[in-house]
Curated annotation (Swiss-Prot):
One of its GO terms (cellular component) is bicellular tight junction. This is Tubulin-specific chaperone D. Tubulin-folding protein implicated in the first step of the tubulin folding pathway and required for tubulin complex assembly. Involved in the regulation of microtubule polymerization or depolymerization, it modulates microtubule dynamics by capturing GTP-bound beta-tubulin (TUBB). Its ability to interact with beta tubulin is regulated via its interaction with ARL2. Acts as a GTPase-activating protein (GAP) for ARL2. Induces microtubule disruption in absence of ARL2. Increases degradation of beta tubulin, when overexpressed in polarized cells. Found in a complex with at least ARL2, PPP2CB, PPP2R1A, PPP2R2A, PPP2R5E and TBCD. Interacts with PPP2CB. Part of a supercomplex made of cofactors A to E. Cofactors A and D function by capturing and stabilizing tubulin in a quasi-native conformation. Cofactor E binds to the cofactor D-tubulin complex; interaction with cofactor C then causes the release of tubulin polypeptides that are committed to the native state. Interacts with ARL2; interaction is enhanced with the GDP-bound form of ARL2. Does not interact with ARL3, ARL4A and ARL4D. Interacts with beta tubulin. Interacts with TBCE. It comes from the Eukaryota. InterPro entries: ARM-like, ARM-type_fold, TBCD, Tubulin_specific_chaperoneD_C. Gene3D superfamilies: Leucine-rich Repeat Variant (1.25.10.10).
Length: 1019
């Protein structure tokens, strides 16, 4: 859509609204494209010379392989033949360089999907492969940025070949070359290649690190070259600085090589060098680096050095749950067996644990604990895994010290990063059985706090990753411990997980909590009503936040174990949340939960909220006012349903507290400024809910105060921010409607004449304000007035609104006020009803229907534009909607008030708008057009060419026709050119579309389907 033709204002949407989460996944059963891939690989020899064809075939292969990123195991049966086809090209000495590199590119794409560790095993590793692969690597240019896939795959291939069980010296033969010069031994050639590629900046560096880890651990290489290689890496580390790009690249390669080496090397081989490497690593001070990858590699190396220092043995003291079968876990007999196994394991002699722990371990553990507080997740995650691995090799006392140090991460003086890292580490310990049952009582409070950790920091919040980690910790506990160990904490953990699954702000946390709850239900079998809750709050159900708050929560609260914890969480943690959307959802959830615990709401929650509603904290005050409104309304509805007094659940103190909210805020001038943008709609909502609750405040002075607030809010709209205006306006209008219906009507169903005259006159006078927003507010306010307030003043109100819809030089850009005036006219018509022979001061009748239609039809031609674009589109859209509402109202009551001329004008203008170039307005016009055409209870009279229209737009296609698609809409619209009544208007609309900047409408709009003489008949 062209810039000049966009919907200038669009719809006003809340920026903080949670984005819709759509989970789309490909659940595949096999590698269905195997034949297509075979054909692609077979065509490489024919297309490599054409760059365009080469790019096409590569992109096709990438698209196919990317489908299997989440299910790469489906490729396993096909990897061998794919590799063989590509290796045939690579081994062919006649393959041109372009084809050679293209084959390696395809190998890399496969490796990227399946992972190099598995793909590595498939490489041929015969003795005869060593020399050719070495020669191919030597022929490569390490600086060629176009062929990095070739170098990466060759190094991986070499890392597999170098595992051949023969002394490399046998490959050297005659060490003298033909020219008489000494030739470099094969061992040194491979090492030089590895060293060369450890200092490059591309992907080959990763493969070089893998090569080093496989090559250096060979017995012959270890004896002759390991010490020298480690000296070289430590020297390179010492000379490099992470403050330069070159130094960062070098350090990355060295750290990868060392980490891989200490992972794959034997402990007895690496132990003599571990202390030296650790000392060098300390001197590098990687914790001060801004490079996340360097800090992560440093953490990985530190933990592997720590594992080298301690013996590779499983701790005898670790907690062993025993049977892992889900079915057995739920059987009482199995539980007894497991308890016996645990007792035996706990009583085993610990004679093997008496060994000295090197002093370096303290340094290693300290660095890992510091790593848990790193600012980046991948560093914390690496540190957490290191803590788990090393703790499993420590004696029981030292391991308990590590757990104690971990628990220090969970003080509120620590950052959210420390909490997150601590949760990950505790989960690792629990998963490995290293967190003994004696520590569960210390860890459970941490879980409960972490599951609700949410803090605002600047313009965003922190804590979502922490809550996610807490769910992982709960999941790990479910798998690690016998149900009997967690029995004392079951209610706390289950309630916390339910609350996180239903009320968390972030969808990933809700889903993580749901998964953790499911794991606990399956593994523990002790969560109250676990299966029932899982059915309602499964992984997919919790994806929709509104559904969680308003529907799922009500179902779960039906189980008494969860009712009060859920209510308390909303009151304590959510109504004061930094996100206004969460606050509003929480108050609506409280409304829905009130029938589950009405006495608790009335006697505990409401008295707790009333002081908060006039407190000092803005967010708490906002949420508390809304919560008071929703809970009060719910209690009154419940009392009414049970045939009790409206005030059954309220005492005098509560009623007085509700009345005092507005007076207190007004006296403290809290309606001013940015805070007022929250307070005004909140108190208006309170007014609306108290009015709907029929509170006994009739004649009370508070009613005047509420009316003042509504009027002042509408007058203050120009001062509100753009984001808040709509909400303030809607809240005030809704409050006005409810207030009038409850407190301004007497026993005879009429209004006090003085009050009516003052209110209506005041609102009509505001319609001529020089501020557009004031016109908008009071237009909608007039539209919201009940029938008894409009009685005797209808013509005056309609005339005032008609003037707002007129375009004058002074207010040509007041599109929003014209839109809202049209909306108000339609609302008023529906409020007062239709009576053909009635008074024009009370009903829509024959005396004023023509004037109403004239006002609405006049606005269908509003094409005002300004810097925001086609703002007149808002007016046209509102006019079309109002025309539809008024017409259907008349048709259903007194259809004779609609004459043929009016109906023709309506349908013709709608037909013109259906040829609109802006998709949104075209779709709306088309929808209104078809609604009037196919309405049949009773049908709209006097529609020109009804039979032809029903043939062009069959009733069966009314809902499926996509008006947003120009290619679908215009072929239908152009057929109206054959109908004389519509020709001029449709051609006018098509002309605008053809001349517009939008390519699709310009192409689709020409009347190709209208017949050869359609245009001629017009003239």
């Amino acid at each position: 859509m062209a810039v000049g033709e966009t919907d200038g204002a669009g719809s006003e949407e809340s920026g903080s609204r949670e984005a819709d989460v759509i989970s789309r996944g490909n659940i595949l059963e096999s590698f269905t494209e195997s034949q297509e891939v075979r054909a692609l690989l077979g065509n490489l020899r024919t297309v490599y010379g054409d760059p365009v064809a080469q790019e096409v075939i590569v992109e096709k292969f990438i698209v196919i392989m990317d489908k299997y990123q989440e299910q790469p195991h489906l490729l396993d049966r096909h990897l061998e033949w794919m590799m063989n086809m590509l290796l045939d090209i690579i081994r062919d000495s006649g393959s041109p360089p372009v084809l050679f590199h293209l084959a390696f590119k395809f190998l890399y794409i496969i490796t990227k999907v399946r992972g190099y560790k598995l793909f590595l095993r498939l490489f041929p590793h015969e003795v005869t492969d060593l020399q050719p692969v070495l020669d191919m690597i030597v022929d490569q240019n390490p600086k060629d940025c176009e062929t990095w896939e070739t170098r990466y795959m060759l190094l991986l291939w070499l890392s597999m070949i170098c595992l051949i069980p023969f002394d490399l010296a046998r490959f050297d033969g005659n060490i003298l070359s033909e020219e008489g010069h000494t030739r470099m031994p094969t061992m040194d050639r491979i090492l030089e290649i590895a060293k060369c590629y450890l200092v490059v900046s591309d992907k080959a560096r990763d493969a070089a690190a893998v090569l080093v880890s496989k090559f250096i651990v060979r017995p012959d290489v270890r004896q002759k070259r390991m010490a020298d290689f480690l000296d070289w890496t430590l020297s390179m580390l010492s000379k490099s600085s992470f403050q330069s790009m070159e130094g960062t690249v070098v350090m990355n390669g060295m750290l990868q090589a060392l980490a891989q080496l200490f992972k794959h090397g034997k402990r007895e081989d690496c132990l003599p060098y571990a202390a030296t490497v650790l000392e060098c690593l300390d001197n590098c001070k990687l914790s001060e680096s801004n490079q996340m990858v360097l800090r992560k590699l440093g953490m990985k190396l530190v933990q592997r050095l720590g594992l080298t220092f301690v013996k590779p043995k499983v701790a005898k003291w670790r907690y062993q749950r025993g049977c892992r079968s889900l079915a057995a876990n739920l059987q009482a007999q199995s539980s007894v067996m497991q308890s016996q196994k645990i007792t035996v394991a706990a009583n085993e002699a610990e004679d093997d644990e008496e060994y000295d722990i090197p002093g370096e371990i303290e340094n290693v553990v300290e660095q890992l604990l510091v790593g848990l507080k790193d600012k980046d997740t991948i560093v914390r995650w690496s540190a957490a895994k290191g803590i788990g691995r090393i703790t499993g090799r420590l004696p029981k006392e030292l391991a308990d010290d590590v757990v104690g140090s971990l628990l220090d991460c969970f003080s509120f003086q620590e950052t959210d990063n420390a909490w997150h890292g601590g949760c990950l580490a505790l989960a690792e310990l629990g998963r490995r059985g290293l967190l003994l049952p004696s520590r569960i009582s210390d860890v459970v409070p941490v879980i409960l706090k972490a599951l609700t950790y949410d803090e605002k920091r600047g313009s965003c919040s922190v804590g979502s990753n922490l809550r996610d980690a807490a769910c992982y910790l709960s999941w790990a506990f479910a798998r690690a411990y016998d149900p009997s160990e967690l029995i004392p904490f079951i209610n706390q953990i289950s309630s916390a997980l339910v609350i996180a699954a239903v009320f968390d702000r972030d969808v990933n946390c809700r889903r993580a909590a749901s998964a953790a709850f499911q794991e606990n239900v399956g593994r523990q079998g002790t969560f109250p009503h676990g299966i029932d809750i899982l059915t309602a709050a499964d992984y997919f159900a919790v994806g929709n936040r509104v559904n969680c708050y308003l529907t799922i929560s009500v179902y779960i609260a039906g189980f008494p174990e969860y009712t009060q914890p859920m209510i308390d969480h909303l009151v304590n943690m959510k109504i004061n949340h930094w996100d206004s959307v969460i606050r509003e959802l929480s108050t609506k959830a409280l409304h829905n939960l009130t029938p589950r615990a009405p006495e608790y709401m009335a006697n505990v929650v409401l008295p707790r909220l009333l002081p908060l509603s006039v407190g000092t904290d803005l967010h708490t005050r906002h949420g508390a006012i809304l919560a008071c409104a929703e809970i009060t309304h719910a209690l009154c509805k419940l009392a009414e349903e049970n045939n009790r007094s409206i005030t059954y659940y309220f005492n005098g103190k509560s009623l007085e507290g509700l009345k005092q909210i507005h007076q207190e805020l007004c006296s403290r001038q809290l309606y001013r400024g940015l805070g007022g943008e929250l307070m005004r709609p909140a108190v208006c909502t309170l007014i609306e809910k108290l009015s709907l609750s029929k509170m006994p405040f009739k004649g009370d002075p508070i009613i005047e105060g509420w009316q003042w607030l509504i009027n002042d809010s509408l007058r203050s709209l120009p001062l509100a921010s753009c984001a808040a205006r709509q909400h303030v306006k809607e809240s005030a209008v809704s409050a006005l409607s409810a207030l009038c219906n409850e407190y301004y009507i007497n026993e005879n169903g009429e209004a006090d004449p003085a009050l009516q005259g003052e209110l209506v006159t005041q609102y009509i006078s505001e319609l001529q304000s020089t501020e557009q927003m004031i016109r908008c507010g009071f237009s909608l306010a007039l539209g919201a007035l009940p029938r008894f307030l409009l009685k005797g003043r209808l013509q005056q109100v309609l005339e005032g609104l008609r003037k707002v819809t007129l375009i004058t030089p002074r207010d040509v850009s007041f599109a929003e006020s014209r839109r809202d005036a049209l909306i108000a006219i339609a609302e008023i018509c529906q409020t007062v009803g239709v009576k053909g022979e009635g008074s024009q001061e009370e009903y829509i009748c024959k005396d004023n229907v023509a004037q109403i239609y004239a006002t609405l039809l006049n606005c269908v031609t509003d094409y005002t534009t300004d810097s925001r674009g086609d703002v007149g589109g808002w007016v046209r859209e509102a006019a079309m909607t109002s025309l539809m509402k008024v017409t259907l109202l008349l048709v259903q009551n007194e259809a004779e008030l609609i004459n043929a001329n009016i109906c023709k004008q309506i349908m013709c203008w709608l037909a013109q708008q259906s040829a609109e170039k802006i998709d949104k307005f075209r779709a709306h016009a088309g929808s209104v057009f078809l609604t009037l055409l196919h309405f049949d209870s009773p049908p709209v009279p006097h529609i020109p060419h009804r039979e032809e229209l029903e043939r062009i737009f069959p009733r069966s296609e009314a809902e499926t026709l996509n008006w947003n698609a120009a290619s679908e809409a215009f072929p239908r619209i152009t057929q109206l050119l054959a109908l004389p009544a519509y020709q001029y208007y449709v051609l006018l609309g098509l002309s605008v579309s053809v001349g517009g900047l939008t390519e699709t409408t310009g192409v689709c709009a020409p009347p190709d389907n209208a017949g050869p003489n359609a245009g001629k008949r017009l003239f």
